[in-house]
C-alpha cells in the first residue's frame, strides 16, 4: 500500500525514532508499504518517520555505483532496522541532496565519504556494511531522519539557507495548517 508522505513542518520529522524491540508482521508490512511508497515517489531511500511511523527503520534501493558513477538499483529494498553508524571517514565530500519530505528542493551538503552501518534485517539478523560515495550518503541521509534531522539542517551556504526559507514556508503552508514552533527551520 502506498502511504501518504510526511512533509516539512510535520512534527514526526523532528522526533527521535523509537527502537524496534521485535520484528513483527506489522513491521514487515510497513517495509512493504515503504518500498511501494518510495518507488511511487521515485525515491532511493525512505525512513519510517517519512510515512508517519516514529520507528528506527529505513529502506534503501541502491546497491552501489558502477565505475562510471551510475547507480545500481535493487529489485527489493535493503532494510535497516535500528541502525547504528560508525567509522565515518574524515574526508568530507559535497553532494547534492533532495528529500521526498521536502519536495522540489535540493542543496549541497557535506558528508563523510564513507561510513559503516550496523543494523538488523527483516529476519532479525545483525549485519554490518561499509559504504562509500553516494550509497554512504543515502544511508547517512536516511539515518538522520531517525534522529529528527533533515538535510537542510546541514546546509552551510548562507545564500542557500536564505533562498530555502521562503520555499520551506510554502511547503509548510501547503501541507500543514499548524506547526509547533520547535518544528520550524531556524
Curated annotation (Swiss-Prot):
Tell me the gene name: def
Q: Which UniProt keywords apply?
A: Hydrolase, Iron, Metal-binding, Protein biosynthesis
Enzyme Commission number(s) of this protein: 3.5.1.88
Role, per record: Removes the formyl group from the N-terminal Met of newly synthesized proteins. Requires at least a dipeptide for an efficient rate of reaction. N-terminal L-methionine is a prerequisite for activity but the enzyme has broad specificity at other positions.
Instruction: Report residues binding Fe cation.
Output: 99, 141, 145
Active site, UniProt feature = 142
Cofactor annotation comment: Binds 1 Fe(2+) ion.
Give GO MF terms, alphabetically: metal ion binding; peptide deformylase activity
InterPro entries documented for this protein: Peptide_deformylase, Peptide_deformylase_sf
- Which protein, by its recorded name, is this? Peptide deformylase
Claim: Disulfide bond is one of the keywords in the record: no
Amino acid at each position: 500500500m502506498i502511504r501518504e508522505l510526511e512533509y516539512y513542518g510535520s512534527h514526526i520529522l523532528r522526533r527521535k525514532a523509537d527502537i524496534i524491540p521485535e520484528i513483527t508482521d506489522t513491521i514487515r508490512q510497513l517495509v512493504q508499504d515503504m518500498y511501494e511508497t518510495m518507488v511511487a515517489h521515485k525515491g532511493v531511500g525512505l525512513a519510517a518517520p517519512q510515512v508517519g511511523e516514529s520507528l528506527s527503520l529505513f529502506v534503501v534501493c541502491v546497491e552501489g555505483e558502477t565505475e562510471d558513477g551510475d547507480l545500481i538499483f535493487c529489485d527489493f529494498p535493503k532494510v535497516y532496522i535500528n541502525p547504528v553508524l560508525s567509522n565515518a571517514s574524515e574526508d568530507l565530500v559535497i553532494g547534492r541532496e533532495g528529500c521526498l519530505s521536502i519536495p522540489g528542493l535540493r542543496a549541497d551538503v557535506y558528508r563523510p565519504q564513507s561510513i559503516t552501518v550496523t543494523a538488523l534485517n527483516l529476519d532479525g539478523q545483525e549485519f554490518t556494511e561499509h559504504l562509500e560515495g553516494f550509497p554512504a550518503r543515502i544511508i547517512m541521509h536516511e539515518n538522520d531522519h531517525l534522529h529528527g534531522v533533515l538535510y537542510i539542517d546541514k546546509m552551510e551556504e548562507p545564500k542557500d539557507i536564505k533562498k530555502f526559507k521562503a520555499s520551506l514556508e510554502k511547503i509548510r503552508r501547503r501541507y500543514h495548517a499548524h506547526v509547533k514552533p520547535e518544528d520550524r527551520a531556524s
